[in-house]
UniProtKB/Swiss-Prot annotation:
It is found in: Chromosome. Residues 478-494 have a biased composition (Low complexity). GO terms for biological process: protein ubiquitination; response to UV; transcription-coupled nucleotide-excision repair. Belongs to the UVSSA family. This is UV-stimulated scaffold protein A. PANTHER family: UV-STIMULATED SCAFFOLD PROTEIN A. A zinc finger (UVSSA-type) spans 570-597. GO terms for molecular function: chromatin-protein adaptor activity; RNA polymerase II complex binding; RNA polymerase inhibitor activity.
């Protein structure tokens, strides 16, 4: 066997199986078949190459390899014998007969491979089943043991069909539960929906008096047709036609009159046109009038229809938010599942009725009033409790004057008589038992309850009231003189200026030497010496104070760091890079990649000869320390001979030629299995399981555990947790 043809066959098989194409390249496949015709040894080598590719964990490689098997299987008896000898392993790698060894990804290609393999095995059995016993056994194994349906277009296995049946049963069970729930809801809610429709229709009919049946489509159509018939006649002719029609009815009832009398009566009934025009003063029978009548009906909310409008608004909200979505869900479930016609008809009629009543509501164009909501706000410091509620506008029709016979009932004093005093007396203020604003009954009850809670010493309201009184003491009732007032005002003004100055002034930390500047420190360098360190037994001796000289020196001295003036770095590293450029880092002393920075020229060569000699010695030393087998040229030769990557292309550092360490893909045409799909789950995983995020979470959890252990370190109960 020629080694050149052997290598060429290996290269062709690798190129065909790693192309990633759904179909084989016929030109290269012809070369493979041409080499296999030479000798059986090439077929043996081809068989081993194919089985190696079928064991790869990539569905695209297996699909291309199986297509090559199908091409050679029908042309070589020797290849058929080799393949059928190891037919069980071949089925495991292509048909997925072993559940513990599923086909590798991508899933779509794996599904296509399994379908193609089952169809091909069926065609092989039909053609070569009688000649090859193991092929027939393999076919019956798939059909009877693995329950493969060869007539199925998708050629699904037993496990797939079971999964599909379970999924279908689960969907049927879910739909059945939804159907039962919809039927139960329909039985319970139908009466309520019909009552809501009746109430809303009645309210709309009361708001818009429909004397002309505007909401009835049949009546509206009949009215429009009669209007169109009469639109071509003048107004006076319409009256004449009505009068003429009435008299014609009278003529039909009178059947005993002769033809002459009927003609005379007809002549008498028809008025003279000229006489009619002269009597009415009209110039012509036909006149054209243009009237702009608004077709939109608009209902305004007033005091008279306020109750109706509120009811319509509540019912409209109930229909739009509750009833209509519920009925639509019923119709959707009934459509998917398929129910009896009567149930579907009832649901459809309910839906149409709800939509019709909503169209009526839109036709009315109701102008709702703005509703004011009474909101309680939190009282600020220094405010009275009476200001906790928002002011309510006066009600329409309210009269501030209260009659005399009702003043006692309202708790007001009687108005003095006008005979005793010449001036008009003002009504006295009402007697208020508790600080409750007369807003409404609910507000008064709320304020009364708050007052009761303040009187109860066990409530939090009483404690808050005491704290408010302490923070904001009541002003004294005595009237100060002018001098005290001026003193207080001057002190307040000085305090305000100090506060402003302290607010603007920066806060700088200082030591004890500045705190006791110009004074003698009382406890400078003195510490208390405890002779006994026992936990329970303490001696009777008095603890003595000892002066520490180091501490005294620290209290009297200060160390001030002089930072100096910042000088920016103007030089660059300029060390040669693997890609041919120069290092642009501007470190002050040392570059983290190229060591100490030395002066270099524009080409990156050292300016000083001493630096050049030192760099040459360091380079020679590194080469001597490196083993001989790490020589790049030797490694490249070994790689070319063995076909394995020994790392000759890898360089120390950031990579070369600007690739930043990214190696070239060996088979770029194949689908990258390591590349994750850009889904929401992958994006969330990338953010949540990021190293920095995990580190921050770990630090926070460690701090929490540390605080817990420090707090409960001496309690044996928490030591067990």
């Amino acid at each position: 066997m020629d080694q050149t043809m052997r290598d060429k066959l290996s290269q062709l098989v690798e190129e065909l199986t790693t192309s990633g194409e759904p179909q084989l390249n016929q030109d290269k496949m012809k070369e493979v078949k041409k080499i296999c015709r030479v000798s059986d040894s090439y077929i043996d080598h081809f068989y081993h190459l194919i089985m190696t590719q079928l064991n790869q964990e990539h569905a695209e490689i297996r699909l291309s390899a199986f297509q090559m098997v199908n091409e050679v299987f029908s042309r070589s008896h020797h290849f058929r014998v080799l393949l059928i000898t190891n037919f069980q392993e071949f089925l495991e790698l292509t048909v997925e007969t072993d559940a513990e060894q599923p086909l590798p990804p991508p899933k779509e290609v794996a599904r296509k491979l399994r379908t193609l393999a089952i169809q091909t095995v069926q065609s092989w059995h039909a053609t070569y089943g009688e000649a090859y016993k193991k092929l027939s056994l393999g076919y019956h194994f798939l059909k009877q043991i693995k329950k493969v349906d060869f007539q199925d277009v998708e050629a699904r296995t037993l496990a797939e069909r079971k999964r599909q049946e379970e999924k279908q049963k689960r969907l049927e069970r879910i739909y059945k539960e939804k159907l039962d729930k919809a039927k139960q809801e329909m039985e319970e809610m139908t009466s309520g929906i019909e009552e809501t429709l009746t109430e809303m229709n009645n309210c709309i009919r009361l708001l818009a008096t429909d004397d002309f049946n505007l909401f009835d489509e049949d009546s509206a159509a009949s009215i429009s047709t009669t209007a169109e018939d009469q639109s071509d006649q003048p107004c006076c002719s319409k009256d004449l036609s009505n009068e003429h029609n009435g008299k014609m009815m009278e003529k039909k009832t009178d059947k005993e009159q002769t033809d002459e009398s009927s003609d005379e009566s007809d002549m008498e009934e028809v008025p003279d046109e000229d006489a009619f025009l002269r009597s009415t003063g009209l110039m012509s029978y036909r006149y054209q009038l243009e009237l702009d009548v608004s077709a939109d009906l608009k209902v305004r909310e007033t005091e008279e229809n306020e109750a109706l409008v509120n009811t319509v608004r509540d019912l409209h909200r109930l229909v739009t938010t509750r009833h209509l979505p519920l009925v639509q869900s019923w119709v959707q479930v009934f459509t998917k599942v398929g129910v009896e016609e009567e149930l579907m008809r009832r649901a459809t009629e309910l839906k149409k009725s709800l939509e019709h009543v909503l169209r009526k509501h839109e036709y009315l164009h109701i102008d709702y009033k703005d509703r004011e909501r009474l909101v309680m706000r939190a009282p600020e410091d220094g405010e009275d409790d009476d200001d906790d509620f928002v002011d309510v506008p006066e009600k329409e029709g309210y009269e501030p004057h209260i009659p005399e016979h009702l003043r006692t009932e309202y708790g007001l004093d009687e108005t003095p008589s006008t005979s005793t005093s010449g001036t008009k007396a003002k009504p006295s203020r009402p007697v208020v038992k508790c600080a409750v604003p007369p807003v409404s009954s609910s507000l008064s009850r709320l304020k009364r309850r708050m007052c009761d809670e303040e009187q109860d010493p066990t409530c939090a309201a009483a404690t808050l009231r005491v704290l408010k009184q302490k923070l904001h003491p009541a002003p004294s009732t005595s009237v100060p003189d002018g001098s005290s007032e001026s003193a207080v005002s001057s002190s307040d003004q000085s305090n305000m200026t100090k506060n402003k100055a302290s607010f603007k002034a920066p806060v700088i930390p200082f030591g004890m030497d500045l705190y006791y500047w110009g004074e003698e420190q009382p406890t400078a360098g003195k510490i208390i010496k405890q002779t006994s360190q026992h936990q329970f037994w303490v001696p009777h001796e008095v603890e003595e104070e000892v002066e520490n000289k180091e501490l005294s020196a620290q209290m009297k001295s200060r160390c001030i760091t002089y930072a100096g003036k910042f000088k920016p770095v103007e030089h660059k590293c300029k060390a040669p890079m693997p890609n041919g450029s120069l290092c642009e880092r501007q470190d002050r002393v040392k570059c983290p990649f190229h060591g100490h920075i030395i002066p270099r020229d524009e080409l990156g060569r050292p300016v000083n000869p001493e630096d050049a000699l030192r760099l040459e010695r360091e380079k020679r030393k590194r080469e001597e320390e490196q083993p001989d087998w790490r020589d790049p040229e030797l490694m490249r030769e070994i790689e070319a001979a063995t076909g394995e990557d020994l790392g000759s292309s890898k360089t120390y550092g950031k990579g070369k030629k600007g690739n930043k360490g990214k190696s070239k893909k060996k088979y770029p045409n194949l689908t990258d299995l390591k590349q994750k799909a850009n889904t929401s789950r992958s994006r969330l995983e990338k953010k949540v399981f990021n190293k920095s995020s995990m580190r921050r979470v770990t630090e926070v959890m460690n701090k929490m555990d540390k605080r817990k252990h420090e707090k409960f370190a001496n309690q044996f109960n928490y030591a067990l947790n």
